[in-house]
Amino acid sequence: MESPSAPPHRWCIPWQRLLLTASLLTFWNPPTTAKLTIESTPFNVAEGKEVLLLVHNLPQHLFGYSWYKGERVDGNRQIIGYVIGTQQATPGPAYSGREIIYPNASLLIQNIIQNDTGFYTLHVIKSDLVNEEATGQFRVYPELPKPSISSNNSKPVEDKDAVAFTCEPETQDATYLWWVNNQSLPVSPRLQLSNGNRTLTLFNVTRNDTASYKCETQNPVSARRSDSVILNVLYGPDAPTISPLNTSYRSGENLNLSCHAASNPPAQYSWFVNGTFQQSTQELFIPNITVNNSGSYTCQAHNSDTGLNRTTVTTITVYAEPPKPFITSNNSNPVEDEDAVALTCEPEIQNTTYLWWVNNQSLPVSPRLQLSNDNRTLTLLSVTRNDVGPYECGIQNELSVDHSDPVILNVLYGPDDPTISPSYTYYRPGVNLSLSCHAASNPPAQYSWLIDGNIQQHTQELFISNITEKNSGLYTCQANNSASGHSRTTVKTITVSAELPKPSISSNNSKPVEDKDAVAFTCEPEAQNTTYLWWVNGQSLPVSPRLQLSNGNRTLTLFNVTRNDARAYVCGIQNSVSANRSDPVTLDVLYGPDTPIISPPDSSYLSGANLNLSCHSASNPSPQYSWRINGIPQQHTQVLFIAKITPNNNGTYACFVSNLATGRNNSIVKSITVSASGTSPGLSAGATVGIMIGVLVGVALI
């Protein structure tokens, strides 16, 4: 409250503070028409504080005024009276010594108590002895103490108990509020407020209800919060978890198992092996385990406060260290395409998985590879040289895979047809002849040379120096494999001549189809130190992406041949002493049939005339022809002749062509109109001249 600007009466009521600001003076001389009112400042007052009953619109020319406790003027309830003329204040029966009256009639009450609550009446006496009254009021509230929370259950059990929190103390005219983790109460069917919100009940408490709870009390003059209360919910134990999750161990390892179960208070643990109690610890340690330590391991968790027990069982398997595997074979030297081989993974062990690898890869899918029921034996049927391996087998248990050393299969094969090099067959006198023979074989082949059927030597190479024309002949290389018992020979014709022979042209395709086939011409023979040349129609080869030379220009390839490639091809060979050309070879390109042409072009005729139609289509070989009139087969000729035609011969005339060599067909349709004698054979809408061209693929020629 602010101090007044005008002093109270002189009698012994000390000034304690100013209650009215300078603006209050404006109310001392209000207009006489305004109604007298009292304003309580503040309206809600805390115990021990003060309140000012502020007078508004006080009338002029007053004799005095008095304050009363209550809503009416009662001498027994007078607090104080004031005479303006003498400026004297007189206390009444209800005066407590805490009241101060001011010349403007306002009343200050200090050190407010609960009994001060209520109405106060100001009685004003004017100079003309006319009275006027006004009533004001205020309410007194206590200053709230700091609340606290009490609980009916300090250790509730999860999913079983309910907890009732009560905000203390119980205070009249107070509002109660609750917070959980400093947040307003969540909406939940398990939370219930009662007793004017003073009691918070949690039904079927869970571990998630373990939170910070606070209550608050409020009234119009104060608000206080309690200290936090943490709810201690007893729960568990949950189903224990045994770690690590590994259930397979090698013999000789240490077994170290740990058990954990969510629980409040923390659980007590016990271990059982195959149903036999071991120890009451959270961890179980067994050093240097053996196969005998295999079994079921049970962890039991117990909560003495909740009275609950939970168990978890894990099965531990201890494996003996397996030996390193190795591979045995029933045939150490199998013959290609004759023998089968059975590879067996040793040793035989129970409860073991057998695995196989070939060339460090898993076994390919092949009808020639067969595994036994237990996968321990791998059988290769009709072995080939590609089956040499290496092969590995493995034995696998829950812990590891052990590999054998690799085994290489020694497949006996060959000899294949020998190859004689170099490939030259033509030599000049005076040079050295050096021939080498090679045949794929295991073990390596033994070689022999024969000339014109006569044994020369048992070596892989044949060398003859300073050859003459007498050295011309048949040179045979014979390869022998004593292990497989097989022999193979290759014969090569060697010609020794000072002059180059007349070359010839060979072809890989004597009748290529246009726009489909490629043709490779090769100039024969292959001769040492020889240059090969080509001509087409007596001219050097044109530049074309469809023409390609290879094999030292000895081979000429024509890609996607066309009918224009049907020319005369000549090859030539030359060396330092001679040159020669082949006879020309004409390429026979099969093509067509193209779209046929019907002649003459006339389509209108007079009745009585002869109709003579001829059909022609470019094709190699020449095509076969057939005719149809209005879709009806007629004859298989190139020319269609009808004497003395009539209007009945009107219609569509189709010529079909077919090339059996290329497998292609084609056709053309022509409309023929025959007019009666004496009429003009002009073109009408019904006799429009037109040629409808189309390829009728798959139409059978009749």
Curated annotation (Swiss-Prot):
Source organism, top-level taxon: Eukaryota
Residue ranges of the propeptide: 686-702
GO molecular function: GPI anchor binding; identical protein binding; protein homodimerization activity
Record annotation: effect of changing Q78 to L/R: Abolishes dimerization. Reduced affinity for E.coli Dr adhesins
Topology in the lipid bilayer: Lipid-anchor; GPI-anchor
Lipid-conjugated positions (GPI-anchor amidated alanine): A685
Annotated disulfide bonds: C167-C215, C259-C299, C345-C393, C437-C477, C523-C571, C615-C655
GO cellular-component term (any): apical plasma membrane
Domain Ig-like C2-type: 145-232, 240-315, 323-410, 418-495, 501-588, 593-675
Domain Ig-like V-type: 35-144
Effect listed in the UniProt record for changing L129 to A/C: No effect on dimerization. Reduced affinity for E.coli Dr adhesins
Stated consequence of mutating F63I: No effect on dimerization. Reduced affinity for E.coli Dr adhesins
A family per Pfam: V-set
Result, substituting F63R: Abolishes dimerization. Reduced affinity for E.coli Dr adhesins
Keywords, ordered alphabetically: Apoptosis, Cell adhesion, Cell membrane, Disulfide bond, Glycoprotein, GPI-anchor, Immunoglobulin domain, Lipoprotein, Membrane, Oncogene, Repeat, Signal
Signal peptide segment: 1-34
UniProt-annotated location(s): Cell membrane; Apical cell membrane; Cell surface
Modified how: Complex immunoreactive glycoprotein with a MW of 180 kDa comprising 60% carbohydrate.
SMART domains on file: IG, IGc2
Result for mutant: L129S: Abolishes dimerization. Reduced affinity for E.coli Dr adhesins
Tissue specificity: Expressed in columnar epithelial and goblet cells of the colon (at protein level). Found in adenocarcinomas of endodermally derived digestive system epithelium and fetal colon.
Entry similarity comment: Belongs to the immunoglobulin superfamily. CEA family.
Known role: Cell surface glycoprotein that plays a role in cell adhesion, intracellular signaling and tumor progression. Mediates homophilic and heterophilic cell adhesion with other carcinoembryonic antigen-related cell adhesion molecules, such as CEACAM6. Plays a role as an oncogene by promoting tumor progression; induces resistance to anoikis of colorectal carcinoma cells. (Microbial infection) Receptor for E.coli Dr adhesins. Binding of E.coli Dr adhesins leads to dissociation of the homodimer.
PANTHER family: CARCINOEMBRYONIC ANTIGEN-RELATED CELL ADHESION MOLECULE 19, CEA CELL ADHESION MOLECULE 8
Record note on quaternary structure: Homodimer.
Protein name, entry field: Cell adhesion molecule CEACAM5
